[in-house]
Amino acid sequence: MSQSTSVLRRNGFTFKQFFVAHDRCAMKVGTDGILLGAWAPVAGVKRCLDIGAGSGLLALMLAQRTDDSVIIDAVELESEAAAQAQENINQSPWAERINVHTADIQQWITQQTVRFDLIISNPPYYQQGVECATPQREQARYTTTLDHPSLLTCAAECITEEGFFCVVLPEQIGNGFTELALSMGWHLRLRTDVAENEARLPHRVLLAFSPQAGECFSDRLVIRGPDQNYSEAYTALTQAFYLFM
């Protein structure tokens, strides 16, 4: 069996320049992560941090979008997900500049001396509720192992003065996250509200915070046009990644 045939049979997602297997990860590749990885500002970055790396999707997307000199650290608490992220990265063109760490981000941060120009996270956002099928799924869905104040604190401890901390969240939760971030000294610099189509209200929000004050740029992104095909804006944002776009 050829390698390509083997890869395509695995449980994962094929992009133009890399493949992400996610069968051992609690949270699968989805639109939220793809949006965040394509949207986060990468101009001039030298060092990136992916908090809660999961399958390694965001780290791989950042690697594709940045120069060969950029180093990316991907921190994942759950050992099976971290192992799969490492496998995905090893099979990518950027294995030498993405470092996977199986660690609790709150402990890992205390051991670091470098600061990051870009920090990215697709964080859990549900309060603990209905019990999940596995502890891994619960960890990925609920803010039990890393709540939002702790996440913001971790990012603040290792970001450069002009760096960006980027997240994707449901719209209402994103509004609360923004209020919390502002109260902790962060400044909102970029905001994109995401709607499925023009007729619907936004259901997701992409947020970029910085320690440095400055103008906040806001816009709206519609995923699908009237014909139900991907909109021009969504296509422009993601076409470097989607295989058939």
Swiss-Prot record:
Q: What is its main location?
A: cytoplasm
Q: From which domain of life does this come? A: Bacteria
Q: Which GO terms describe its molecular function?
A: nucleic acid binding; tRNA (adenine-N6)-methyltransferase activity
EC no.? 2.1.1.223
Reaction catalyzed:
adenosine(37) in tRNA1(Val) + S-adenosyl-L-methionine = N(6)-methyladenosine(37) in tRNA1(Val) + S-adenosyl-L-homocysteine + H(+)
Q: Which UniProt keywords apply?
A: Cytoplasm, Methyltransferase, S-adenosyl-L-methionine, Transferase, tRNA processing
Gene3D superfamilies documented for this protein: Vaccinia Virus protein VP39 (3.40.50.150)
Q: Where is this gene product found?
A: Cytoplasm
Enzyme class, first EC level, given as a word: transferase
- A GO cellular-component term linked to this record: cytoplasm
Give GO BP annotations, semicolon-separated. Answer: methylation; tRNA processing
Q: Which InterPro entries has this protein been placed in?
A: DNA_methylase_N6_adenine_CS, SAM-dependent_MTases_sf, Small_mtfrase_dom, tRNA_Adenine-N(6)_MTase, tRNA_adenine-N6_MeTrfase
- Identify the PANTHER family for this entry: TRNA1(VAL) (ADENINE(37)-N6)-METHYLTRANSFERASE (PTHR47739:SF1)
Biological role stated in the UniProt entry:
Specifically methylates the adenine in position 37 of tRNA(1)(Val) (anticodon cmo5UAC).
Per the similarity annotation, which family is this? Belongs to the methyltransferase superfamily. tRNA (adenine-N(6)-)-methyltransferase family.
**What name has this protein been given in UniProt?**
tRNA1(Val) (adenine(37)-N6)-methyltransferase
